[in-house]
From Swiss-Prot:
Subunit structure: Part of a tripartite efflux system composed of MdtA, MdtB and MdtC. MdtB forms a heteromultimer with MdtC.
Start-end of Basic and acidic residues biased regions: 1043-1056
Protein name in the entry: Multidrug resistance protein MdtB
Lineage of source species: Bacteria, Pseudomonadati, Pseudomonadota, Gammaproteobacteria, Enterobacterales
Family, as annotated: Belongs to the resistance-nodulation-cell division (RND) (TC 2.A.6) family. MdtB subfamily.
Organism annotation: Xenorhabdus bovienii (strain SS-2004) (Xenorhabdus nematophila subsp. bovienii)
GO cellular component: plasma membrane
């Protein structure tokens, strides 16, 4: 059969070229699967990479940090420490609260961890105090993860205790039931209660003490089972008036009889409705509020969870009185949606730019249509695989697709360009398609699998970073694979039926001008290529110098972990002197809020003070600042934070720590700043000595700002020294003394009022409004022998001391967490090195262990693995190329293009003022896969010319460079323009995308300029080396054969 017959050639594409209906239906199936997958994909900011985290909170009002540590935290820690798969355990014990955070291995399902935690709590129950008012409560939530939704409930007409009651019963419970919600907390703490404030002098005058009041109320307000009885025909349930539900009932309660006359509770105490905890407060801007913070479960979908909550808000608002208002203060999904929409726009822009490049190079609208169909088809088809893999539409997967827009068109371009070349020579479209597709099939396979090989190491990255980029790598690999399938099936089929013979094509002026332009460029390139090939040593010097320059740039470029995002939210911690009172702290918080609201870029400010599960000490307050939308601001969050801190700098005795909220939360405890490290010692006294020394030294380092610690050992403590002998002689036990103190100063929960909707506590405390400071102890009385009233002051002395406000543990040992931010002109690498150098310079003893935490620890792990990751990518690609080419040499020639990309990427980052972070490293790894395409296309054609046409290596590589110049330039421009929207992005989340785009564009420009010359030179160098060793081996074999012949017995036979 004639070679031009359409029935010959075609390789793997042959079947699809000859069966257009089957090919079309196959592509429609891919398209439909992708569309269905896209509609079902969830939306999120980043892939779900959370550690399984559980927080256990135990409240014991009135207990000191020492008591909380020894009788609550320690028993629980011992049980939790036995759980298999526990990665890290931290705890914070403060006045009245114990918070333990358990972080599990990524491989452990959260539900399994939950069961183990519940079992551990049950095992520790017998060791916990009997009068613990609340059992330990666990939540499947990361405390460092900022709320996904913050609501403020306010009222000008109703008291906050009434508003809190409505919020608890009508709103918080309903929100908690939404799937994906991990924890709903109410900041402001105005839960209704009955407060009994006894007059110490009055009860002493009647020969009573506080314990009498407590036991009387406990015995008078009960609610227990009473049974039932059956009559002849009916059953009767028993009930009594055993519960006291009204204030008047408590006021009229008889405490004792003296001289036959009743002493009622109102005679010795003030009874009123109030808040269960008077030392909690929250404000929305400057208005008192109940603030609802909604946190998600680790791994939950933020968008779905928030949408479900928003859908029920109208119903919840309607359930409240008209005098009560509920407003949304923050919604993290607003910026997540905006960020995803920006990336989607950039994806469409990348596709448009790529199509434009194709048209400029191909000069044919019909030819341009073919790869233009391949791009969306490959990308849309990827959504189906993403859905089956459980991925989401997020910044990283959309970035992968945006980059893929430049990749996936490469295969189609190479196929079309090769087929068009045969059509230009006079071949019919069908014959050209079969011949061109058959010739280029192996190249497409080489390009595809070598590029996917680069992504393989990303799949084996460990821990959080590996989880983070797994979706990115698989999404990109799938898009590339689908692209190869489309390029070997649909593209040649469409070429065979849509492209016209050269004689039938009429080019317009633009197309003719572009053709002349490229012919001129190719002619210029050919002239320069001859010079380079004739003087190879200069080019080789440039090639090897780029390798050295890449290493130098890598060592000198600042290194970071993850780009700082501007999501329009700022988390803050306000720290005051450790001995500050609640009222004084409240004044400070309101003063700071008023100053912050004066900033033109601040939308609203939410603040909270007091001790509960989310805040550990009274001298620290939490802030959440919502900024105006990015398009309404002139500056970004990293410039706003110093300005806000400067605004409050003149407020005396307070320090404001601020950090922007990030989508990627690796930390597992609420911190003052972005980065943390922990000092851990077996002896607390060692930490007392070295923590202040290290903190003071770190404050002097220019690389660090906002250096702080959670070491709070300067709180005021009233130490009561009891004369045990005298107390024993008077018949007073230590239990009685502790109870008297707890009754007076502990806001003691002594009873509970049960209703069908809620439960309300009865709180006992001493009325100290007319007593200042330490004088309040003078009115504490006890009952001794013969029911005599004994003042506490007769058996004890009170001494003011300094003590701990909170006690922190890491893995059950005392620990202190240092917090810091990185100075604007410094990098995270420089900051970490500064911490290490400072520790060495002050002579930190070896028995104090330093551990970096959260993002800082992840940065160190990532930094240590960077070179291994790049090396693994290179080795993976070498193995794949070696298998494809059945050669040890040709893969080295192809990989010689890599240093040029590294130089371009690193130079672009340094010029742009960017750090080498995780995103940039991913960009460099992708460049490794892209730039080798140029070499593959050259070497494939050179080897074919040597093998099939008998050309010399010089002529073969020269002709290959000229023939493949246009597709090389076209594919590079397509990849470059695909990355350009990322480099130029300015919207929300642009901080994530820009480093990737800069790496890609910088690396592609540099590699395009250099590899067009270095690759053919290195090809010829290795060819000469191969021939040299081949000749040397042949000469050695010939010499060996000659020696064997010389020593053969035939040559030594005697003549006859």
């Amino acid at each position: 059969m004639h070679s031009d017959s359409p029935m010959t050639g075609g390789g793997p594409s042959r079947l699809f070229i000859l069966r257009p209906v089957a090919t079309t239906l196959f592509m429609i199936a891919i398209l439909l699967a992708g569309i269905i997958g896209y509609r079902m994909l969830p939306v999120s900011a980043l892939p779900q990479v959370d550690y399984p985290t559980i927080q256990v909170v135990t409240l014991y009002p009135g207990a000191s940090p020492d008591i909380m540590t020894s009788v609550v935290t320690a028993p629980l820690e011992r049980q939790f420490g036995k759980i298999s798969g526990l990665k890290q355990m931290t705890s914070q014990s403060s006045g009245g609260a114990s918070v333990i955070t358990l972080v599990f291995q990524l491989s452990l399902p959260l539900d399994v961890a939950e069961q183990d935690v519940q079992a551990a709590i049950n095992a520790a129950t017998n060791l916990l105090p009997n009068d613990l008012p609340y059992p330990p409560i666990y939540s499947k939530v990361n405390p460092a993860d900022p709320p996904i939704l913050t609501l403020a409930v306010t009222s000008d007409a109703l008291p906050m205790i009434q508003v809190q009651d409505m919020v608890e019963t009508r709103i918080a419970q309903r929100i908690s039931q939404v799937g994906g919600v991990g924890l709903v907390t109410l900041a402001g703490g105005q839960r209704p209660a009955v407060r009994v404030k006894f007059n110490a002098q009055a009860i002493a005058a009647h020969g009573l003490n506080s314990e009498t009041i407590r036991t009387t109320i406990m015995n008078a307000n009960v609610s227990s089972a009473k049974g039932s009885f059956d009559g002849p025909t009916r059953s009767v349930t028993l009930t009594t008036n055993d519960q006291m539900k009204s204030i008047d009932e408590y006021r009229n309660l008889i405490v004792a009889y003296k001289n036959g006359a009743p002493i009622r509770l109102r005679d010795v105490a003030t009874i009123e409705r109030g808040a269960e905890n008077t030392k909690l407060g929250a404000w929305a801007n400057e208005k008192p509020a109940i603030v609802i913070n909604v946190q998600r479960q680790p791994g939950a979908n933020v968008i779905d969870t928030t949408d479900n909550i928003r859908a029920m808000l109208p119903e919840l608002i309607n359930s409240l009185p008209k005098s009560v208002n509920m407003d949304i203060l923050t919604d993290r999904t607003v910026t997540i949606r905006a960020s995803v929409q920006d990336v989607q726009f950039e994806l469409l822009l990348a596709i448009a730019l790529v199509v434009m490049v194709i048209y400029v190079f191909l000069r044919n609208a019909t030819a341009t249509l073919i790869p233009s169909i391949a791009v969306p088809l490959s990308l849309v088809g990827t959504f189906a695989v993403m859905y089956f893999c459980g991925f989401s539409v997020n910044n990283l997967t959309l970035m992968a697709l945006t980059i893929a827009a430049g990749f996936v068109v490469d295969d189609a371009i190479v196929v079309i360009e090769n087929i068009s070349r045969y059509i230009e020579r006079g071949e019919k479209p069908m014959a050209a398609a079969l011949k061109g597709a058959g010739e280029i099939g192996f190249t497409i396979i080489s390009l595809t699998f070598s590029l996917i090989a680069v992504l393989i190491p990303l799949l084996f990255m460990g821990d959080i970073v590996g989880r983070l980029f797994r979706e990115f790598a698989i999404t990109l690999a799938v898009a590339i694979l689908i692209s190869a399938v489309v390029s070997l099936t649909l593209t040649p089929m469409m070429c065979a039926r849509m492209l016209k013979a050269e004689a039938e094509i009429k080019h317009n002026r633009f197309e003719q001008a572009s053709e002349h332009f490229f012919e001129r460029i190719i002619a210029i390139y050919g002239g320069w290529l001859k010079r380079v090939l004739n003087h190879p040593w200069i080019t080789l010097g440039v090639a090897f110098s780029t390798l050295a320059f890449t290493a130098l740039l890598y060592l000198t470029i600042p290194k970071g972990f993850f780009p700082l995002q501007d999501n329009g939210l700022i988390q803050g911690t306000l720290e005051a002197p450790q001995s500050i009172s609640f009222n004084a702290m409240s004044d400070k918080q309101r003063e700071v809020t008023a100053l912050l609201l004066q900033d033109p870029d601040v939308e609203n400010v939410t603040t909270f003070i007091g001790v509960d599960g989310s805040n550990s000490t009274l001298n620290s307050g939490r802030l959440q600042i919502t900024l105006k939308p990015l398009n309404q601001r002139d500056i970004r969050v990293d410039e706003i934070i110093p300005r806000l801190q400067a605004r409050v700098a003149n407020v005396p005795d307070v320090k404001l720590y601020l950090q922007p909220t990030q989508d990627l939360t690796i930390d597992t405890q609420v911190a003052r700043t972005q980065y943390q490290f922990t000092l851990q010692g077996t002896v607390s006294n060692d930490l007392n000595i070295w923590v202040p020394k290290l903190q003071e030294a770190l404050k002097q380092r220019p690389e660090l700002v906002d250096v702080g610690t959670d070491w709070q050992n300067r709180g005021l403590v009233a130490y009561i020294n009891v004369n045990r002998d005298m107390a024993s002689r008077l018949g007073i036990s230590m239990t009685a003394i502790d109870n008297a103190l707890y009754n007076a100063f502990g806001q003691r929960l002594i009873s509970t009022i049960y209703t069908q909707a809620n439960q309300y506590r009865v709180i006992l405390e001493q009325d100290t409004q007319n007593e200042a400071g330490m004088n309040a102890f003078n009115n504490v009385h006890l009952i001794g022998t013969d029911n005599k009233v004994v003042p506490l002051s007769t058996i004890a002395t009170v001494e003011q001391q300094l003590g701990y406000l909170s006690i922190n543990h890491l893995q059950q040992f005392p620990a202190v967490t240092f917090s810091f931010n990185v100075a604007q002109e410094a990098s995270l690498e420089a900051a970490v090195n500064a911490v290490k150098e400072t520790e060495r310079s002050i002579g930190m003893p070896k028995n104090i262990n330093t551990q970096f935490q959260g993002a800082t620890l992840a940065f160190q792990d990532a930094l240590g693995n960077t070179l291994w990751l790049i090396l693994a990518a290179v080795i993976s690609m070498y193995i794949v190329l070696g298998i494809l080419y059945e050669s040890f040499i040709h893969p080295v020639t192809i990989l010689s293009t890599l240093p040029t990309a590294g130089v371009g990427a690193l130079l672009a980052l340094m010029v742009g003022g960017y750090e080498l972070d995780i995103i940039a490293i991913i960009g460099i790894i992708l460049l490794i896969g892209i730039v080798k395409k140029n070499a593959i296309m050259m070497i494939d054609f050179a080897l074919a010319a040597e093998r099939e046409k008998g050309m010399s290596p010089y002529d073969a590589i020269f002709q290959a460079c000229l023939l493949r110049f246009r597709p090389i330039l076209m594919t590079t421009m397509a990849a470059l323009l695909g990355a350009l929207p990322l480099m130029l992005s300015t919207g929300i989340g642009a901080e994530l995308r820009r480093p990737l785009g800069i790496c890609m564009v910088g690396g592609l420009i540099m590699s395009q300029i250099l590899t067009l010359f270095t690759t053919p030179v290195i090809y010829l160098l290795f060819d000469r080396l191969a021939n040299y060793f081949k000749n040397k081996r042949q000469n050695r074999l010939q010499s060996q054969n000659q020696r064997e012949l010389d020593h053969s017995p035939v040559n030594h036979q005697e003549p006859l």
